Amino acid sequence: MNIRATVLASFCLFAMPVLMLAQTDEIQVYDGEIAPPGIFNLMIHNNFTPKGRTVPDYPGAIIANHSYQVTAEWAYGVTPWFEQGLYMPVTSPYSSNYGSTINGFKIRELFARPNAHDHTFFYAANFEFSVNHHYWESRTITSEIRPIVGLHLHPWDFIYNPIVDTDYTGGLGNLQYNPSGRAAYNFNDRWALAAEEYDGFGPLHGFLPLSKQFHEVWATSDYSGSEFLGLSVETGVGYGLTTASDKWTLKLMLSRNLNVHPWRP
């Protein structure tokens, strides 16, 4: 094997365990809230990386540095405990190595304790099934399992999402552990400030060395109300703690219910 082939093989070996963090269509800690039955909701996720990783996480992947991701997340409240979601389209309006791309789509099912905001302890489970282009993920089909647990200790909220991701290779031991968490202070029923963390430890059968793990801390602000055309708004700035993380990332999430009166098929 020549030197170039050896280097490429080594790169793939170390990049593959973190490939599921190559890019993301959403940067969000789930709080167990779902759309009311019969209500459609649309959320637009905007993520921009002004200073990030400058090499692809696997051969052919979108480069994170200076990339901009936009995803439309459609949701429909089926019952008080079940919300059906669809992410489409998942796009990158800009990346340095591909320009503008459509990256795939994703279906999700979110099961939650009804009226989670009214309970001190709440819980939920989210399941996602993704179809990806090769530059977005190294595998065409990937999935996420996201348990959700949290406490409403007014005015504080504490939420943890112990997420596992899979590309359906390597069995249970190759599940990727990518948890996220959030601690929020609610000034009132409209405004909140929060600290968030997003992590990627690697496969369950053996976590990666710390330098190769993904760890970002975030400061976010949240608004929900009717002042801005009925929009709920979340903004945030994230800072990477390891060399495998993006140094700076920005996010903007805009969401709105699309109907007032419940609709049933």
Give the location of each predicted region.
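Cleavable N-terminal export/targeting peptides
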Residues: M1-E26, H261-P265
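Transmembrane beta-barrel domains of Gram-negative outer membranes and organellar outer membranes
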Residues: A22-P265
